[in-house]
Amino acid sequence: MASMIRSEIHIPDHEVLRKIGGGAYGEVWMARGVTGALRAVKVVWREDFEDERGFEREFEGILKFEPISRDHPGLVNILHVGRGNDSENPFYYYVMELGDDVHSSREFNPVEYQARTLRSDLKASEGVPLDVGFCIDVGQRLAESLQYLHEKDLA
C-alpha cells in the first residue's frame, strides 16, 4: 500500500515524472517545474524514521542547509523546501538541481536520465583505474565542502 501511495506524490508547481534514486532516508524523483526545467525532488517519509524526533531533526537540518546551499560550489543547490499534505503518510521534500547525466552533462532527457556518480565513472572506466589527479581533485572538493558544512555547524 505504501508504494502505491508513494507513486502519487504531489509536489506543488511540479509534475512528478519518475523515481531516479533512493536510500535509507528517502526517494529522489525527477520532476518538471512550471517553467519546464527538470529538477530532482527528494522526498523524506516520516515512516522511514523510528520516531517523530528523528524525522523533525532531519527536517530542521535541511531548513538550516537550504539558505547556505548556494554559498559554496561543492554543495547541491536547494531551490525549495516543503511539507507534503498527506496526514496519513507525512513527508517533507526539497527541490534541487539535477546532477550531471551519465550520458550527457548538458541536455537532460527525462526518459533516459541517469545521474552521474563515482560508481558510474568507475563502471565507464571498464576496470581501468581512475586518473590519480581526478581522484585527488574529487577528494579535495569533498573535503572543502565538508569543512564548510562544519563551519556552519551542519556536519
Kindly label every feature range from the protein language model.
Residues 27:
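Conserved N-lobe ATP-binding subsite of Hanks-type protein kinase domains
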Residues 31-39:
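Conserved N-lobe loop of protein kinases adjacent to the ATP-binding glycine-rich P-loop
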Residues 45-69:
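AlphaC helix of the eukaryotic protein kinase fold
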Residues 77-92, 100:
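Short beta-strand micro-motifs within the conserved protein kinase catalytic domain, predominantly
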Residues 94-101, 110-111:
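Short pocket-lining segment of the protein kinase catalytic domain that shapes the ATP-binding cleft
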Residues 104-130:
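AlphaC helix of the protein kinase catalytic domain
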Residues 138-139:
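Activation segment signature within eukaryotic-like protein kinase domains
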Residues 142-155:
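Protein kinase catalytic-loop region centered on the HRD/HxD motif
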